[in-house]
Structures are given as C-alpha cells and as structure tokens.
Amino acid sequence: MSQWTHVIATFRAQGIDHPMFPQINWQNRMSKNVPHGSEGPLQIVVNVSRDFGRVDTVVTVWGDLRDYDDEAEIMTYFTSIIPTPQQGAFIGEGVVRIRIEECGDDPEREYHYKFVGDGQSGEWMSIKR
C-alpha cells in the first residue's frame, strides 16, 4: 500500500510596480527544491495582477505526493519561497494544509503565515487541528 501526502496551499503577496523596486520572478523562485513524490511534484500556479502601481500575486500550490511523508521538508520549501519586503514583496496572508495518510493520531496539519517582531518579516506557524 502506498503512502500519500496531500498538500494544498495559497498565499498572497503585494509589491510595488515601479522600476525602482525589485520585481520577483515567481516561477524561478517557486521551481527550486519542489517536494516530489514517486509520481511527480507539487503543482504550482502563479497569478500576477498589475494595477495602480501595485503588483498583487496569488500563489497556489497543491498535490498528492505518493510514497512521501516528509512534512518538515514541505515546510522548509514553503519557508524558502517567501520573499522579504527588501526582495520586492510583502506577504499578506498564507495558509498551508498537509494531510499524511496513515500517520497515526495527528495526520493533518495546518500552518498560517504570521508576522513576527517588526512586522516586516514572518514565519509559518503550526495551527493544531
């Protein structure tokens, strides 16, 4: 019997659409070290909207990873793709939900992106389900 890990995630980033400010290449940023099961990696869709001098980006990630159960590696990936304001984007909201089949009493985890300290940076915080 196969081990399956199900992932659904989304986050929203805001930036300034002006040559003075750094612009993020989301496809390049997202494509490094993507968690990968025996039948393929997580799927990624990036939607970018430019209006009134702003860049609004919504990133959606999902997938069913076969023969994979490394929750820590998934969260390391999500931590690595979040930019800082100095890199060109401010993360408004984010959520990651991971469900590992046949994982005992606590197979499902949810993480929310929360701001810490100065409000310029944040981290993924586990929400007990």
Model-derived features: positions:
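Charged interaction segments
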Residues: 27-129
